[in-house]
Each structure stands twice: as structure tokens, then as C-alpha cells.
């Protein structure tokens, strides 16, 4: 019997994308079965190619589509003469064609299904057309009493048919009242809390400019602030902190990052913000600054950047700066820059910059590190590729 199509339940659409309108297609399939018993089967004397037919059957009294089973007891042709051939035949049909799948089996002495064979797909039937199996079962196996397939000399065939009916479409529109979880606004809310200086409990004086903040937020975000407020330090007792080694704008950008995880002005002050991030153990901000400085490396600033990276233990930035120096040195020797022809007289050599000369005097160990790396480096491909820094 057929099943009426039902629209998708709300739970089916509870995950994944939600469309404004939808369609649910139900392909109707009518399933029914038929049993055919042939009494005194061993007396069937039909020759090869001759046929026995069952009576007609259908899915129900109102179904005008009629079927029958066709058996060739001694096969259909020379190829199948040692087999029993079995087919499903469409006797009459009000439609021009119909598609159906079928399954044949035998019932043994215990009324159990055995030797089942099933169509692998839905076949196209027209009136008078049959589909089945030319070699359904070997005759010698079937006639052997030890196999129990002919109890009392009765052959019982069981057939299951699945007929594809018309498909049904159900369409509609998604309920506009579907719940939507708002996006998280934690960063915006904390940023507003700081900007509005509400419920603050400590003050920072940065070169004369006051900034109010919340101890709990700072302690949660920075191990340095956590230690400052946790112990009986003077800053914790007075709720007042003096900072004289940072510019107010740099401190403000650092605080914005602490509250929101963002630093919109980072590119303008990446070097000074790196120092602040290192001082207050803000590892993610530190790597963000390293990445910004890496993207702006040049012949003129690479030595100063290397010194800055060494001073604040920015190991990824340091490695990138040394790599930049080595690549530029090799490319200069090859007479090219960034994969293009390069006249070395038109560009300042890194070793001739004031930053490099200053580094020789103040940080000679960095010069040694750069030369050691250069000595072990191989000639690179043209261009100066940049590696993406690992975010903490």
C-alpha cells in the first residue's frame, strides 16, 4: 500500500542553512506481493521455451494495472535449458508505461523464503512486456528432494512488486518566526564598558593622561596585571598606576585590545605596541604586531626591526628579519630584486644603512647571527616570500 507524502518536520530544518521557501518531493511507491503455487510440478512436461502463467493480480481491487507471473519450467532457450526461468509480466495497464522493481523467491517446506533474486533497478514496463531471470534456479537443484524446495511436489513462488507512481510536490515558505540566535557582542559590550568608564575601580596615569579601567578585566587578560592586583603592591592598595614608558596613544590602543581583542590602529604604531604587548604579556597582540612589522620590512628598516625583535623576544619577527636580510643579500649578488632586473647602485644596500651601522655597534651578536644564517642559506627562488606568523 502507498504512503501519503508528508512535509518536512521543523526538526528536519533545525540545522544548516534555512531557505525562505522550500519544496518536498515524495515519489509514491505502491508495494504488494503475490504467491503462486504449482501443484504436481514434477509432472510439468513443457518443452524448452514453453510457458506456464499464473492468474492475474494487482495491488488491490481498484487497481486497473494487472500483472501475472510467467514460468518456463525447462528454460527459455538453449542457454537456460537446465534452469527454471521466471518473469513478471504486465498484462494490462491504463498508462502508456510504468516503472517497477521486483523480487522473486521460493518457499521451502518450512514456508521460509529462499533463493531470492531481486531486480537492481526499476525497469520500464509497457503492456505485454516482461522482465525477470532466465536462469532463476537450476532444475537439478530444484528437483533434488534433499533441498526441500518441492514439498509434496508443490512449487511455491513468492513475488514482491514495487510500482513507482506519480511524484507529489509539497512546497511552502519557512516560518518567519524561526528563532535566530543573535551574534555575540561580548567584544562590543566590553569595549563600551571601557569607553564609558562605567563601574571602573582603578586608574592609570600615562605621562599625565588618566585612563580608568576594571581590575577584573585586566587581571583576566594579562598575567602581569593579574600579579599586580593580586599581591599587596602599592598599585593594588591605591588603585592608581603610574606608567611613564608608554605613550598615551599606545596605551589606549593596548587597552582597546584588552577589552575587545582588536587593535584597529595597530599598523600605525606596531613597533611601540609590540613593546607594550611584551611588557604586559599579551601574547596574541604581540604576534599581531610581529605580523604587521613583517609585512612592512624594507631595506631601510630591517636592521632596526631586527633589534626591536631581539629586545622583546619576538622570535618569529626576528627569524623573518634575518631571512629578509639574507634573501636581499643573495638577490643583490644575482643583480635582481623581487624577480626583476635590479641595478645595485640604485638602491641602498642593507649594510650601508644607518640602522645596520648602529646595530654593529650596539648589537654585534645580531650581525653575527645574520651572517651565520647567510652562510648556511641556499640561493632562493626569485621574490621574497613571506611566511604567515603563527598566532598564539
From Swiss-Prot:
SUPFAM superfamilies: POZ domain, TRAF domain-like. One of its GO terms (molecular function) is identical protein binding. Gene3D superfamilies: 6.10.250.3030, 6.20.250.50, Apoptosis, Tumor Necrosis Factor Receptor Associated Protein 2, Chain A (2.60.210.10), Potassium Channel Kv1.1, Chain A (3.30.710.10). The keyword Nucleus applies. It comes from the Eukaryota. Residues 200-267 form the BTB domain. GO terms for biological process: negative regulation of protein ubiquitination; proteasome-mediated ubiquitin-dependent protein catabolic process; protein ubiquitination; regulation of proteolysis. CDD domains: BACK_SPOPL, BTB_POZ_SPOPL. Keywords: Nucleus, Ubl conjugation pathway. The keyword Nucleus applies. Residues 31-161 form the MATH domain. Belongs to the Tdpoz family. Component of a cullin-RING-based BCR (BTB-CUL3-RBX1) E3 ubiquitin-protein ligase complex that mediates the ubiquitination and subsequent proteasomal degradation of target proteins, but with relatively low efficiency. Cullin-RING-based BCR (BTB-CUL3-RBX1) E3 ubiquitin-protein ligase complexes containing homodimeric SPOPL or the heterodimer formed by SPOP and SPOPL are less efficient than ubiquitin ligase complexes containing only SPOP. May function to down-regulate the activity of cullin-RING-based BCR (BTB-CUL3-RBX1) E3 ubiquitin-protein ligase complexes that contain SPOP. Homodimer. Heterodimer with SPOP. Component of cullin-RING-based BCR (BTB-CUL3-RBX1) E3 ubiquitin-protein ligase complexes containing homodimeric SPOPL or the heterodimer formed by SPOP and SPOPL. Interacts with CUL3 and MACROH2A1. This is Speckle-type POZ protein-like.
Amino acid at each position: 500500500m502507498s504512503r501519503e507524502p508528508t512535509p518536512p518536520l521543523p526538526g528536519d530544518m533545525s540545522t544548516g542553512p534555512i531557505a525562505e521557501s522550500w519544496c518536498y518531493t515524495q515519489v509514491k511507491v505502491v508495494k504488494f506481493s503475490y504467491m503462486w503455487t504449482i501443484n504436481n510440478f514434477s509432472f510439468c512436461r513443457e518443452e524448452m521455451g514453453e510457458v506456464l502463467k499464473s492468474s492475474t493480480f494487482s495491488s488491490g481491487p481498484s487497481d486497473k494495472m494487472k500483472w501475472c507471473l510467467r514460468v518456463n519450467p525447462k528454460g527459455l532457450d538453449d542457454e537456460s535449458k537446465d534452469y527454471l526461468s521466471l518473469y513478471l509480466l504486465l498484462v494490462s495497464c491504463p498508462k502508456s508505461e510504468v516503472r517497477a522493481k521486483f523480487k522473486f523467491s521460493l518457499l521451502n517446506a518450512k514456508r521460509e523464503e529462499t533463493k531470492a533474486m531481486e531486480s537492481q533497478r526499476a525497469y520500464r514496463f509497457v503492456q505485454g512486456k516482461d522482465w525477470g531471470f532466465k536462469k532463476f534456479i537450476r532444475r537439478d537443484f530444484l528437483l533434488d528432494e534433499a533441498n526441500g524446495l518441492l514439498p509434496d511436489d508443490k512449487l511455491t513462488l513468492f513475488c514482491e512488486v514495487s510500482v513507482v507512481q506519480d511524484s507529489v510536490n509539497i512546497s511552502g515558505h519557512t516560518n518567519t518566526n524561526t528563532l535566530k540566535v543573535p551574534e555575540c557582542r561580548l567584544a562590543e559590550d566590553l569595549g563600551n564598558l571601557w569607553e564609558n568608564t562605567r563601574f571602573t575601580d582603578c586608574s592609570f596615569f600615562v605621562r599625565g593622561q588618566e585612563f580608568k579601567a576594571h581590575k577584573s578585566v585586566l587581571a583576566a587578560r594579562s598575567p602581569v596585571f593579574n600579579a599586580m592586583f593580586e599581591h599587596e603592591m602599592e598599585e593594588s592598595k591605591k588603585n592608581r598606576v603610574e606608567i611613564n614608558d608608554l605613550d598615551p596613544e599606545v596605551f589606549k590602543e593596548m587597552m582597546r585590545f584588552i577589552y575587545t581583542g582588536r587593535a584597529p590602529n595597530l599598523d600605525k604604531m606596531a613597533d611601540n605596541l609590540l613593546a607594550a604587548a611584551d611588557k604586559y604579556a599579551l601574547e596574541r597582540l604581540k604576534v599581531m604586531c610581529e605580523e604587521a612589522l613583517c609585512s612592512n620590512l624594507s631595506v631601510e628598516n630591517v636592521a632596526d626591526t631586527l633589534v626591536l625583535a631581539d629586545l622583546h623576544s619576538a622570535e618569529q619577527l626576528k627569524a623573518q628579519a634575518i631571512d629578509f636580510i639574507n634573501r636581499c643579500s643573495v638577490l643583490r649578488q644575482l643583480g635582481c630584486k623581487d624577480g626583476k632586473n635590479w641595478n645595485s647602485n640604485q638602491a641602498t644596500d642593507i649594510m650601508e644603512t644607518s640602522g645596520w651601522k648602529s646595530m654593529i655597534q650596539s648589537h654585534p651578536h645580531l650581525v653575527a647571527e645574520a651572517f651565520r644564517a647567510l652562510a648556511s642559506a641556499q640561493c632562493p627562488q626569485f621574490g621574497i616570500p613571506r611566511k604567515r606568523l603563527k598566532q598564539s
